[in-house]
Amino acid sequence: MATSVETAALLSKKALMRPVGSKNANEIGADFEKMIEEGLNKINIGPGGLTGTKSVMGVNVEQAARHPSCLAVGVSTGCWGHRRATIRINADMSYEMISHKGMTL
C-alpha cells in the first residue's frame, strides 16, 4: 500500500520476496497480515482449490507513507517454490539443492 501505483507495485514485489512465515516489522502491519491470512484460510479453498483448511501459506504486506486522499494497492501472487531456492555449488561444480531436496537441474 502506497501513494502511487509505481511504489505499490515495487512494495508488492518486495512483500512477495519476503521469507514464508516472516512478519511485518510494523505491529499494525503484522496484525493486518494475520487478519487477511486467517480470513483467506476460513473460506476453505485449500491447496490447488481442492478444499482444505490452509488456502494460503502466508500474507505479506508492505506499506509506505501516503496522503489520505490517495491509496494505491499492488497485489502479487505466486507459488513460493517458483520464486525461491537455495543451492550450494562446490568447487568441482557439483551442487546440492538445499531447499528442494531430491530435485535435479
Predicted regions and their residues:
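Non-transmembrane, aqueous-exposed alpha-helical and coiled segments at domain scale
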Residues: 1-105
